């Protein structure tokens, strides 16, 4: 991808990067491992963004 990006695209990519994380450990501990994965996780090669 080009190094010079429009600001809107850069913000969308940053938001997608921040949302692509595991749930916090305190959530896993509080739910007694009932919640261990996030349904919004995305792999960079398998699923592409519409950004």
From Swiss-Prot:
GO terms for cellular component: ribonucleoprotein complex; ribosome. Keywords: Ribonucleoprotein, Ribosomal protein. GO terms for molecular function: structural constituent of ribosome. It comes from the Archaea. GO terms for biological process: translation. Residues 32-51 are annotated as: Disordered. Belongs to the eukaryotic ribosomal protein eL39 family. NCBIfam families: PRK01242.1. This is Large ribosomal subunit protein eL39. The lineage of its organism: Archaea, Thermoproteota, Thermoprotei, Thermoproteales, Thermoproteaceae.
């Amino acid at each position: 991808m080009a190094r010079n990006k429009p600001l809107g695209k850069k913000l969308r990519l940053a938001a997608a990067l921040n949302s692509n994380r595991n749930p916090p450990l305190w959530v896993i501990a509080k739910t007694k491992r009932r919640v261990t994965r996030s349904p919004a996780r995305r792999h960079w090669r398998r699923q592409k963004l519409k950004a």
